[in-house]
Protein backbone atom coordinates (compact mmCIF):
# COMPACT_ATOMS: atom_id res chain seq x y z
CA UNK A 1 0.00 0.00 0.00
CA UNK A 2 1.47 3.30 -1.06
CA UNK A 3 1.72 6.37 1.09
CA UNK A 4 -0.95 9.03 0.68
CA UNK A 5 1.49 11.70 1.86
CA UNK A 6 3.73 13.37 -0.71
CA UNK A 7 6.48 14.86 1.36
CA UNK A 8 8.17 17.98 0.01
CA UNK A 9 8.66 18.43 -3.72
CA UNK A 10 11.72 16.35 -4.47
CA UNK A 11 12.51 12.69 -4.19
CA UNK A 12 15.93 11.95 -2.76
CA UNK A 13 18.06 8.85 -2.34
CA UNK A 14 20.29 8.62 0.71
CA UNK A 15 23.75 7.41 -0.32
CA UNK A 16 25.85 6.47 2.69
CA UNK A 17 29.48 6.14 1.64
CA UNK A 18 31.56 5.65 4.78
CA UNK A 19 30.54 7.71 7.78
CA UNK A 20 27.73 9.97 8.86
CA UNK A 21 29.94 12.98 8.16
CA UNK A 22 30.07 12.01 4.51
CA UNK A 23 26.30 11.71 4.17
CA UNK A 24 25.08 13.58 1.11
CA UNK A 25 21.56 14.13 -0.17
CA UNK A 26 21.22 13.92 -3.94
CA UNK A 27 18.08 15.05 -5.74
CA UNK A 28 17.50 12.46 -8.45
CA UNK A 29 13.89 13.13 -9.46
CA UNK A 30 12.43 16.61 -8.88
CA UNK A 31 8.65 16.97 -8.90
CA UNK A 32 7.29 19.17 -11.65
CA UNK A 33 10.18 18.50 -14.02
CA UNK A 34 10.77 16.23 -17.00
CA UNK A 35 7.12 15.69 -17.79
CA UNK A 36 5.78 14.56 -14.42
CA UNK A 37 4.19 16.50 -11.58
CA UNK A 38 5.27 13.94 -8.99
CA UNK A 39 7.73 11.09 -8.49
CA UNK A 40 7.14 8.26 -6.04
CA UNK A 41 8.11 4.68 -5.12
CA UNK A 42 11.87 4.74 -5.82
CA UNK A 43 14.02 1.71 -6.58
CA UNK A 44 17.74 1.55 -7.19
CA UNK A 45 20.32 -1.06 -8.20
CA UNK A 46 23.97 -1.11 -9.23
CA UNK A 47 25.87 -3.09 -11.85
CA UNK A 48 29.18 -4.77 -10.92
CA UNK A 49 31.11 -1.90 -12.50
CA UNK A 50 29.35 0.59 -10.24
CA UNK A 51 26.81 2.10 -12.62
CA UNK A 52 23.62 3.00 -10.80
CA UNK A 53 20.07 2.66 -12.09
CA UNK A 54 17.33 4.62 -10.33
CA UNK A 55 13.71 3.81 -11.17
CA UNK A 56 10.50 5.28 -9.84
CA UNK A 57 6.91 6.03 -10.69
CA UNK A 58 6.59 9.18 -12.77
CA UNK A 59 3.12 10.52 -11.98
CA UNK A 60 2.03 12.75 -14.83
CA UNK A 61 -0.84 14.70 -13.30
CA UNK A 62 -0.24 14.70 -9.54
CA UNK A 63 0.84 12.71 -6.52
CA UNK A 64 -2.13 10.32 -6.38
CA UNK A 65 -1.49 6.58 -6.40
CA UNK A 66 -3.64 5.96 -9.48
CA UNK A 67 -3.82 7.65 -12.86
CA UNK A 68 -1.42 8.29 -15.72
CA UNK A 69 1.70 6.80 -14.14
CA UNK A 70 4.86 5.69 -15.94
CA UNK A 71 7.97 3.87 -14.79
CA UNK A 72 10.96 6.10 -15.41
CA UNK A 73 14.71 5.65 -15.04
CA UNK A 74 17.91 7.62 -14.60
CA UNK A 75 21.50 6.35 -14.48
CA UNK A 76 24.70 7.49 -12.81
CA UNK A 77 28.29 6.63 -13.72
CA UNK A 78 29.89 8.45 -10.78
CA UNK A 79 28.34 6.75 -7.74
CA UNK A 80 25.33 9.02 -7.65
CA UNK A 81 27.00 12.43 -7.86
CA UNK A 82 25.36 13.23 -11.18
CA UNK A 83 22.47 11.63 -13.06
CA UNK A 84 21.36 11.23 -16.66
CA UNK A 85 18.27 12.69 -18.22
CA UNK A 86 15.02 10.86 -17.51
CA UNK A 87 13.91 7.94 -19.70
CA UNK A 88 10.48 6.31 -19.70
CA UNK A 89 10.80 2.50 -19.54
CA UNK A 90 7.12 1.57 -19.11
CA UNK A 91 4.17 3.64 -20.35
CA UNK A 92 0.73 2.07 -19.86
CA UNK A 93 -1.12 4.91 -21.57
CA UNK A 94 -3.48 6.69 -19.22
CA UNK A 95 -3.40 3.83 -16.73
CA UNK A 96 -1.03 2.96 -13.94
CA UNK A 97 2.36 1.27 -14.27
CA UNK A 98 4.13 1.08 -10.95
CA UNK A 99 5.90 -0.76 -8.17
CA UNK A 100 9.24 -1.07 -10.00
CA UNK A 101 11.32 -3.94 -8.59
CA UNK A 102 14.66 -4.19 -10.43
CA UNK A 103 17.37 -6.80 -9.93
CA UNK A 104 20.50 -7.81 -11.87
CA UNK A 105 20.82 -11.48 -12.82
CA UNK A 106 24.56 -12.20 -12.57
CA UNK A 107 24.40 -15.99 -12.94
CA UNK A 108 22.98 -16.55 -16.43
CA UNK A 109 25.77 -17.92 -18.70
CA UNK A 110 24.01 -16.43 -21.71
CA UNK A 111 24.58 -12.95 -20.25
CA UNK A 112 28.03 -12.94 -18.62
CA UNK A 113 27.88 -9.17 -18.05
CA UNK A 114 24.54 -9.49 -16.29
CA UNK A 115 20.95 -8.90 -17.33
CA UNK A 116 18.65 -6.41 -15.61
CA UNK A 117 15.13 -7.56 -14.73
CA UNK A 118 12.54 -4.88 -14.06
CA UNK A 119 9.42 -6.34 -12.45
CA UNK A 120 6.39 -4.07 -12.22
CA UNK A 121 2.61 -3.94 -11.83
CA UNK A 122 -0.15 -2.40 -13.90
CA UNK A 123 -3.58 -1.39 -12.63
CA UNK A 124 -6.86 -0.25 -14.15
CA UNK A 125 -8.40 1.25 -11.02
CA UNK A 126 -7.42 2.79 -7.69
CA UNK A 127 -6.25 0.43 -4.96
CA UNK A 128 -9.38 0.89 -2.86
CA UNK A 129 -11.57 -0.12 -5.79
CA UNK A 130 -9.36 -3.05 -6.75
CA UNK A 131 -9.59 -4.19 -3.15
CA UNK A 132 -13.39 -4.23 -3.54
CA UNK A 133 -13.12 -6.35 -6.68
CA UNK A 134 -13.65 -3.46 -9.10
CA UNK A 135 -10.36 -3.65 -10.94
CA UNK A 136 -7.30 -5.72 -11.73
CA UNK A 137 -3.60 -5.62 -10.95
CA UNK A 138 -1.23 -7.53 -13.24
CA UNK A 139 2.45 -8.47 -12.93
CA UNK A 140 5.03 -8.01 -15.69
CA UNK A 141 8.73 -7.78 -16.34
CA UNK A 142 11.13 -6.33 -18.88
CA UNK A 143 14.84 -7.09 -19.28
CA UNK A 144 17.92 -5.28 -20.52
CA UNK A 145 21.11 -7.07 -21.54
CA UNK A 146 23.06 -3.98 -22.57
CA UNK A 147 23.22 -1.96 -19.39
CA UNK A 148 19.84 -0.32 -19.75
CA UNK A 149 20.31 1.05 -23.27
CA UNK A 150 17.52 -1.08 -24.72
CA UNK A 151 14.70 -3.06 -23.12
CA UNK A 152 12.77 -6.16 -24.11
CA UNK A 153 9.06 -6.30 -24.75
CA UNK A 154 7.01 -6.77 -21.59
CA UNK A 155 6.28 -10.31 -20.37
CA UNK A 156 3.05 -10.86 -18.44
CA UNK A 157 3.56 -13.34 -15.56
CA UNK A 158 0.26 -12.70 -13.78
CA UNK A 159 -0.96 -16.29 -14.15
CA UNK A 160 2.19 -17.59 -12.47
CA UNK A 161 2.53 -15.18 -9.55
CA UNK A 162 -0.93 -13.74 -8.84
CA UNK A 163 -4.31 -15.33 -8.06
CA UNK A 164 -6.99 -12.90 -9.35
CA UNK A 165 -10.64 -13.75 -9.87
CA UNK A 166 -11.53 -11.57 -12.83
CA UNK A 167 -12.82 -13.98 -15.52
CA UNK A 168 -14.62 -11.12 -17.28
CA UNK A 169 -11.21 -9.67 -18.10
CA UNK A 170 -9.44 -12.95 -18.82
CA UNK A 171 -11.06 -16.39 -18.56
CA UNK A 172 -7.83 -17.71 -17.04
CA UNK A 173 -8.09 -15.18 -14.19
CA UNK A 174 -10.53 -17.32 -12.23
CA UNK A 175 -8.63 -18.37 -9.11
CA UNK A 176 -10.55 -19.39 -6.00
CA UNK A 177 -8.08 -17.45 -3.82
CA UNK A 178 -9.50 -14.17 -5.20
CA UNK A 179 -6.42 -12.02 -4.72
CA UNK A 180 -7.19 -8.38 -5.48
CA UNK A 181 -4.75 -5.61 -4.64
CA UNK A 182 -1.21 -6.68 -5.52
CA UNK A 183 2.15 -4.96 -5.24
CA UNK A 184 5.73 -5.96 -5.87
CA UNK A 185 8.45 -5.17 -3.37
CA UNK A 186 9.53 -1.55 -3.06
CA UNK A 187 13.22 -0.76 -3.54
CA UNK A 188 14.54 -3.81 -5.36
CA UNK A 189 14.16 -7.55 -5.84
CA UNK A 190 17.08 -9.82 -4.87
CA UNK A 191 19.19 -12.73 -6.13
CA UNK A 192 21.01 -15.38 -4.12
CA UNK A 193 24.69 -15.11 -5.06
CA UNK A 194 25.85 -18.24 -3.20
CA UNK A 195 24.60 -21.32 -1.37
CA UNK A 196 21.92 -23.87 -2.15
CA UNK A 197 19.79 -21.40 -4.11
CA UNK A 198 22.51 -19.57 -6.00
CA UNK A 199 20.98 -17.80 -8.98
CA UNK A 200 17.43 -17.73 -7.62
CA UNK A 201 15.73 -14.38 -8.16
CA UNK A 202 13.19 -13.63 -5.45
CA UNK A 203 10.63 -10.84 -5.66
CA UNK A 204 8.89 -10.00 -2.39
CA UNK A 205 5.26 -8.94 -2.74
CA UNK A 206 1.98 -8.44 -0.92
CA UNK A 207 -1.67 -8.83 -1.83
CA UNK A 208 -5.19 -8.53 -0.48
CA UNK A 209 -7.60 -11.47 -0.74
CA UNK A 210 -11.38 -11.47 -0.79
CA UNK A 211 -13.59 -8.71 0.53
CA UNK A 212 -11.94 -5.83 2.43
CA UNK A 213 -11.64 -6.43 6.17
CA UNK A 214 -11.16 -4.08 9.09
CA UNK A 215 -7.64 -2.95 9.90
CA UNK A 216 -6.41 -4.20 6.51
CA UNK A 217 -6.30 -7.82 7.65
CA UNK A 218 -7.18 -8.89 4.11
CA UNK A 219 -3.55 -8.08 3.23
CA UNK A 220 -0.67 -10.50 3.58
CA UNK A 221 2.97 -10.74 2.50
CA UNK A 222 4.26 -13.28 0.02
CA UNK A 223 6.77 -13.53 -2.80
CA UNK A 224 7.65 -15.32 -6.01
CA UNK A 225 10.87 -16.64 -7.52
CA UNK A 226 12.54 -18.03 -10.61
CA UNK A 227 15.34 -20.60 -10.81
CA UNK A 228 15.67 -20.49 -14.60
CA UNK A 229 16.39 -16.82 -15.31
CA UNK A 230 12.80 -15.78 -15.84
CA UNK A 231 11.49 -18.65 -17.94
CA UNK A 232 9.13 -19.83 -15.18
CA UNK A 233 8.05 -18.53 -11.77
CA UNK A 234 6.84 -20.11 -8.53
CA UNK A 235 4.75 -18.52 -5.78
CA UNK A 236 5.91 -18.69 -2.18
CA UNK A 237 3.58 -19.52 0.64
CA UNK A 238 1.84 -16.57 2.28
CA UNK A 239 3.34 -15.31 5.51
CA UNK A 240 0.73 -16.19 8.19
CA UNK A 241 0.55 -12.67 9.66
CA UNK A 242 -2.51 -10.61 8.61
CA UNK A 243 -1.78 -7.06 7.52
CA UNK A 244 1.61 -7.57 5.89
CA UNK A 245 2.44 -4.86 3.38
CA UNK A 246 5.37 -3.27 1.49
CA UNK A 247 7.56 -6.32 1.78
CA UNK A 248 11.32 -6.61 1.09
CA UNK A 249 13.62 -9.64 0.95
CA UNK A 250 17.28 -10.10 1.84
CA UNK A 251 19.62 -13.10 1.87
CA UNK A 252 20.90 -14.45 5.18
CA UNK A 253 23.75 -16.87 5.81
CA UNK A 254 23.12 -20.58 5.37
CA UNK A 255 21.00 -20.14 2.22
CA UNK A 256 18.21 -18.55 4.28
CA UNK A 257 15.97 -15.65 3.33
CA UNK A 258 14.45 -12.86 5.40
CA UNK A 259 11.33 -10.85 4.62
CA UNK A 260 10.98 -7.48 6.36
CA UNK A 261 7.69 -5.60 6.02
CA UNK A 262 5.31 -3.08 7.55
CA UNK A 263 2.34 -3.94 9.75
CA UNK A 264 -0.60 -2.34 7.98
CA UNK A 265 -2.90 -3.20 10.91
CA UNK A 266 -1.12 -0.59 13.00
CA UNK A 267 -1.68 -2.33 16.32
CA UNK A 268 2.03 -3.02 16.83
CA UNK A 269 4.37 -0.27 15.65
CA UNK A 270 7.35 -2.36 14.60
CA UNK A 271 8.56 -4.25 11.56
CA UNK A 272 7.43 -7.80 10.84
CA UNK A 273 10.13 -10.34 9.98
CA UNK A 274 9.71 -13.78 8.38
CA UNK A 275 12.53 -16.31 7.93
CA UNK A 276 12.76 -19.07 5.31
CA UNK A 277 15.26 -21.93 5.22
CA UNK A 278 14.27 -23.03 1.71
CA UNK A 279 14.96 -19.94 -0.34
CA UNK A 280 11.59 -18.29 0.21
CA UNK A 281 9.32 -21.20 -0.71
CA UNK A 282 7.84 -21.33 2.80
CA UNK A 283 8.34 -19.61 6.16
CA UNK A 284 9.81 -21.17 9.29
CA UNK A 285 8.87 -18.32 11.59
CA UNK A 286 7.37 -14.84 11.57
CA UNK A 287 7.59 -12.26 14.36
CA UNK A 288 7.54 -8.57 15.24
CA UNK A 289 11.06 -7.19 15.62
CA UNK A 290 10.70 -4.73 18.51
CA UNK A 291 14.20 -3.43 17.76
CA UNK A 292 12.87 -1.95 14.51
CA UNK A 293 10.15 0.59 15.42
CA UNK A 294 8.00 1.71 12.51
CA UNK A 295 5.08 4.16 12.02
CA UNK A 296 3.44 2.05 9.26
CA UNK A 297 5.74 3.12 6.45
CA UNK A 298 7.98 1.52 3.88
CA UNK A 299 11.50 0.51 4.91
CA UNK A 300 14.52 -0.75 3.00
CA UNK A 301 16.88 -3.64 3.75
CA UNK A 302 20.04 -4.80 2.00
CA UNK A 303 22.90 -7.24 2.49
CA UNK A 304 26.14 -5.24 2.48
CA UNK A 305 28.80 -7.75 3.53
CA UNK A 306 29.77 -10.77 5.59
CA UNK A 307 31.06 -11.03 9.14
CA UNK A 308 32.45 -14.34 10.43
CA UNK A 309 30.02 -16.39 8.38
CA UNK A 310 27.00 -14.18 9.05
CA UNK A 311 25.56 -11.59 6.68
CA UNK A 312 25.86 -7.89 7.44
CA UNK A 313 22.54 -6.15 6.84
CA UNK A 314 21.66 -2.48 6.46
CA UNK A 315 18.13 -1.39 7.30
CA UNK A 316 16.67 2.09 6.81
CA UNK A 317 13.27 3.41 7.88
CA UNK A 318 11.40 6.15 9.69
CA UNK A 319 11.99 5.03 13.27
CA UNK A 320 9.35 7.19 14.97
CA UNK A 321 6.26 5.16 15.88
CA UNK A 322 3.99 8.21 15.91
CA UNK A 323 4.92 9.94 12.65
CA UNK A 324 7.09 9.32 9.61
CA UNK A 325 10.10 11.01 11.20
CA UNK A 326 13.59 10.05 12.39
CA UNK A 327 15.02 8.46 9.26
CA UNK A 328 17.52 5.98 10.68
CA UNK A 329 20.08 3.61 9.20
CA UNK A 330 20.82 0.50 11.26
CA UNK A 331 23.54 -2.10 10.76
CA UNK A 332 23.38 -5.74 11.87
CA UNK A 333 26.47 -7.94 11.88
CA UNK A 334 24.59 -11.18 12.64
CA UNK A 335 21.87 -11.75 10.04
CA UNK A 336 19.50 -9.22 11.60
CA UNK A 337 19.25 -10.83 15.04
CA UNK A 338 20.54 -7.64 16.66
CA UNK A 339 21.19 -4.13 15.36
CA UNK A 340 24.39 -2.75 16.83
CA UNK A 341 25.01 0.41 14.84
CA UNK A 342 22.26 3.02 14.55
CA UNK A 343 22.83 6.15 12.46
CA UNK A 344 20.30 8.96 12.63
CA UNK A 345 20.03 10.53 9.16
CA UNK A 346 17.34 13.20 9.44
CA UNK A 347 14.50 14.29 11.68
CA UNK A 348 12.42 15.50 8.73
CA UNK A 349 9.17 13.94 7.59
CA UNK A 350 10.03 11.03 5.31
CA UNK A 351 8.14 8.54 3.20
CA UNK A 352 9.62 6.04 0.76
CA UNK A 353 13.35 5.45 1.02
CA UNK A 354 15.89 3.05 -0.43
CA UNK A 355 19.50 2.14 0.23
CA UNK A 356 22.09 0.97 -2.23
CA UNK A 357 25.36 -0.97 -1.86
CA UNK A 358 27.72 1.99 -1.54
CA UNK A 359 27.97 1.28 2.18
CA UNK A 360 31.30 0.40 3.73
CA UNK A 361 30.91 -1.27 7.11
CA UNK A 362 34.48 -0.91 8.34
Segments predicted by a language model, with ranges:
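Bacterial Sec-dependent N-terminal signal peptides
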Residues: 1-23
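Asp-box/BNR beta-propeller blade signature and adjacent active/binding-site loops
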Residues: 22-362
Amino acid sequence: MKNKIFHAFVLCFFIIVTTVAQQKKITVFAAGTEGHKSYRIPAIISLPGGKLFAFCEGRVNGSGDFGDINIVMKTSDDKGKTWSALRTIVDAGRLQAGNPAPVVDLTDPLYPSGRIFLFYNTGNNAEGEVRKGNGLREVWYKTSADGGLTWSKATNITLQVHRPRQPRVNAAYNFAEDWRSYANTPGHAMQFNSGNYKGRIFVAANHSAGEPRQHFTDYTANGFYTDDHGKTFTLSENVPVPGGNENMAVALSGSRLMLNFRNQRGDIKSRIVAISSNGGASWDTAYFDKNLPDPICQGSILQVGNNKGQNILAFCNAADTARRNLLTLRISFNDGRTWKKNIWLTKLLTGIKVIIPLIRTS
